[in-house]
Amino acid sequence: MTIASQHDLRRQFRALLESNTCYDAASVFDPMSARIAGDLKFEVGILGGSVAALQVLAAPDYALITLSEFVEQATRIGRVACLPIIADADHGYGNAINAMRTVAELERAGVAALTLEDTLLPPKYGHKTTDLIPLDEAVGKIRAALEARIDPQLSIIARTNAEQLSVEETIGRAKAYQAAGADGICMIGIRDFEHLEAIAPHLDAPLMLITYGNPKLNDMARLAENGVRIVVNGHAAYFAAIKATYDRLREQRGVGPSDLSAKELCIKYSTLDEYRVFAREFMNVQE
C-alpha cells in the first residue's frame, strides 16, 4: 500500500466519524479476513488485541503480545486492506513515551486509526485486571500519541471502561480525553441504552462502542442518534474460523463431532486456565 492510499483510507475513516451513521466494524485478524471484509463492502475493520494474541501467539489476552508482533500483523493486513483498519493498541505498550513509539509504528503499518485505553496493563501485582491508570497519566498518553503522529488524518481514539466507573466518572474521563485532542471516544462496558443515554449527551467527540453483541444495544439507528459512529460487536468471525478448523480436522481424523463451543476452544488452546493460575500464584491478580 502506498502512503497516498494509506492517507485516503484515513480520510475515509474520518468521514465515518463525521457522518450521522453508525457503522458495524468487521473483525479482521489476517490479510485474508481483511480482504474478505473489504470485498463484502464493510466500511471499516478492526484488528483486536485479544484476537491478535490468539492468532499470533495462541495466547490469551494477558498483554503478552509485543508491539513488534502486533505491528507485524497490522502491516500484513495493511498491505492488502481496501478498507480503513482500526488497530487496538491496548495501553500503548507502556507509558506515554512508549505510546509515541506505538503510534509511529502503527502509522507506518498503514492503519487508519488506533485506540489507546486507560487500563492498567500489564496487570500489576495485587491489582485487578480491570483497574485503570490515573486520569492525568491517561491524558498524558493521549497528548503524546497526538504529538507522535505524522499524518494528521490518522485518528487517535481514547478508550475507557464504563463498567468500572460511575456515569459521572465516565463522563469526566471522556471529557478530559476530548480536551486533550482525542479524535473519538471508545467505551466498553455500556450496559444498555439507558446507560449510554446518560453519558452520550455530555460528549462532543464521535463515539465508538465495544458491545460484544449485547442485544440491549442492537439498534444501529438509535446508536447513531446517540453519537455512536463505530460499533464493535465482538470477534465472531475469528471464533467461527477456529470452530470450523477444529471440526474439520476432527472429521479428517475420524474422531467425530465435538460439543465444544468456539469460546471453549479458544480457552483450551490458548491455555487460559494455566495463565490464570500463574496470575493468581505469582502476582496475586484478581480477575
From Swiss-Prot:
One of its GO terms (biological process) is propionate catabolic process, 2-methylcitrate cycle. Mg(2+) binds at residue 88. Its EC number is 4.1.1.112. Substrate binds at residues 50, 159, 235. One of its GO terms (molecular function) is methylisocitrate lyase activity. CDD domains: ICL_PEPM. It catalyses: oxaloacetate + H(+) = pyruvate + CO2. InterPro entries: ICL/PEPM (IPR039556), Oxaloacetate_deCOase_bac (IPR023687), Pyrv/PenolPyrv_kinase-like_dom (IPR015813), Pyrv_kinase-like_dom_sf (IPR040442). This is Oxaloacetate decarboxylase. Its cofactor is Mg(2+). Homotetramer; dimer of dimers. Pfam families: PEP_mutase (PF13714). Belongs to the isocitrate lyase family. Oxaloacetate decarboxylase subfamily. It comes from Azotobacter vinelandii (strain DJ / ATCC BAA-1303). Binds 1 Mg(2+) ion per subunit. The lineage of its organism: Bacteria, Pseudomonadati, Pseudomonadota, Gammaproteobacteria, Pseudomonadales. Keywords: Decarboxylase, Lyase, Magnesium, Metal-binding. Catalyzes the decarboxylation of oxaloacetate into pyruvate. Seems to play a role in maintaining cellular concentrations of bicarbonate and pyruvate.
